[in-house]
Amino acid sequence: PFFLYLPHTAVHLPLVPGKKFKGTSKDGPYGDWVQEIDWSMGELFKALKAEGIDENTLVLFTSDNGSAREKQGSNLPLCGRKGRTDEGGMRVPCVVRWPGRIPAGSSSGALTSTIDLLPTLAAISGGKVPADRIIDGRNIWPILNGKQKSHPREAYYYYQMDQLQAVRSGDRKLFVSMDSKKRNWGKPEGKKELKLFNLAQDIHEDNNVATENPEVVKQLLAHAEAAREDLGDVGRPGKGQRKAGWVEKASPRLLKK
């Protein structure tokens, strides 16, 4: 098996599409750069086909966060943007292709994460994940091939740097109360109250239904406390935290074409 990680810098600011793609869309530099990504992926598929491995290669295309500014595309109907724990900052598309293994044209509403890729790719390639440490992700191959509808994980946690800001289980998402809410840019926001949203009915996170659902709030607060105990929160180290990796004697190499 082979593994290729291809991180496009597009469409991150500054918007700099290649010369031959400028003016090829009706959406300015952003749209032009999207056109270039589309071309780039086409070249990748051509190469796979030329090598005769097109039918036996899993291709996964996704992103790391929502757009940061309007000129980088819209996050609607989601609320918020990059750097925030609203759905618009956290939720991204994921397109997966594997002819004969993943049904063409199928879709899934299951919530998954990039941390699931390690155990998933290991499972489908016949490998094993390390047994001497905790692996945070889960094997989501049954979701990708359409045999499973939901993720085995019971709760997801939304952190802004080292601050736990929200927790989600199913379609219910709770923003926990905070004396000061951290942000990526600018000063922290002021005190925040508990807010509960039903994402199945309120994808833009407009209607706080915490008062009407005390049992759901209680359940999600318990998940939040479990996260703090394991992963930590501001000024509170978690019992499950690992030390950052460190290379004592690094030997970087410059690859020249």
Question: Which role does the model predict for each range below?
Answer:
Residues 117, 169, 178-180, 188-195, ...:
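Long, internal low-complexity/basic segments
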Residues 67-87, 102-110, 115-195, 199, ...:
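C-terminal cap/loop subdomain of S1 sulfatases and analogous C-terminal strand-loop tails that border
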Residues 4-14, 61-67, 136, 158-162, ...:
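Short, solvent-exposed turn/loop segments enriched in Gly/Ser/Thr/Pro and often Arg
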Residues 2-7, 34-37, 41, 58-63, ...:
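Beta-strand elements within well-structured catalytic alpha/beta cores of enzymes
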